[in-house]
């Protein structure tokens, strides 16, 4: 599906413009005490002209079998079963000022970045420019999370800076997320530290652009 940047999109949001639209596709989730199961995810990014994107995502258990994420699929044909999770919030690129990221630090007025694992930036500049992004998410399960990270070309890496929960919500202490645009599809993966377990893979999937 052809995508064009809206004329009224705020320039600050251009690094995230490729997320705009409605996405739907299959995935898998598994965690200690949660057997692996297929899911269907529907995600939408919208804008109102402000320097941010509005976001909403819903996950259902898939009513049917899923052979794998590398097979062709019809997003409309994926049958949603029991509701599993929902979340909504805002994605905001950080423009100007000191940059802070869960994956490294850039001092104000400097292009020197400490990369994940302590690696220095590519001196030849082969990597795409990086923009810091802040994400605020709320879930009806009783959790509110603040993610920080960066968008570099068609890839986004995020990690929680804060996870708050109500007194009745399950224990979730941290999470990381990766999003990438691959051959027109939105690939995603989530690692989670929850219920007393260390950070580990929780879910992943592949979404096709619907609109």
UniProtKB/Swiss-Prot annotation:
InterPro entries documented for this protein: Calycin, Nb(III)_bact/plant, Nitrobindin, THAP4-like_heme-bd
Residue segments, region Disordered: 104-130
Chain segments annotated as coiled-coil in the UniProt record: none
Motif (GXWXGXG): 21-27
Gene3D superfamilies xrefs: 2.40.128.20
Superkingdom of origin organism: Bacteria
Pfam families: THAP4_heme-bd
PANTHER family in alphabetical order: PEROXYNITRITE ISOMERASE THAP4, THAP4 PROTEIN
Family to which this protein belongs: Belongs to the nitrobindin family.
HAMAP family the record matches: nitrobindin (MF_01297)
Protein name (Swiss-Prot/TrEMBL): Ferric nitrobindin-like protein
Species: Beutenbergia cavernae (strain ATCC BAA-8 / DSM 12333 / CCUG 43141 / JCM 11478 / NBRC 16432 / NCIMB 13614 / HKI 0122)
């Amino acid at each position: 599906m052809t995508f064009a940047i809206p004329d009224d999109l705020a320039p600050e949001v251009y690094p995230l413009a490729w997320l705009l639209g409605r996405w739907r596709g299959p995935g898998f989730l598994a965690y200690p005490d949660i057997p692996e199961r297929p899911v269907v995810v529907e995600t939408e990014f919208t804008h109102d002209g402000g320097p941010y994107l509005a976001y909403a995502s819903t996950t259902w258990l898939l009513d049917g079998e899923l052979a794998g994420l590398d097979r062709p699929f019809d997003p409309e044909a994926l049958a949603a079963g029991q509701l599993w999770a929902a979340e909504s919030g805002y994605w905001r690129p950080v423009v100007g000022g000191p940059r802070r990221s869960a994956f490294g630090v850039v001092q104000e007025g400097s292009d020197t970045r400490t990369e994940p694992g302590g690696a220095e930036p590519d001196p030849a500049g082969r990597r795409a420019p990086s923009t810091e992004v802040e994400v605020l998410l709320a879930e009806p399960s009783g959790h509110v999370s603040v993610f920080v990270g960066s968008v570099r070309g068609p890839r986004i890496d995020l990690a929680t800076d804060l996870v708050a929960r109500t007194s009745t919500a399950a224990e979730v202490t941290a999470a990381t997320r990766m999003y990438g645009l691959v051959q027109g599809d939105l690939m995603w993966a989530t690692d989670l530290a929850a219920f007393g377990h260390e950070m580990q893979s929780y879910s992943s999937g592949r979404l096709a652009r619907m609109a």
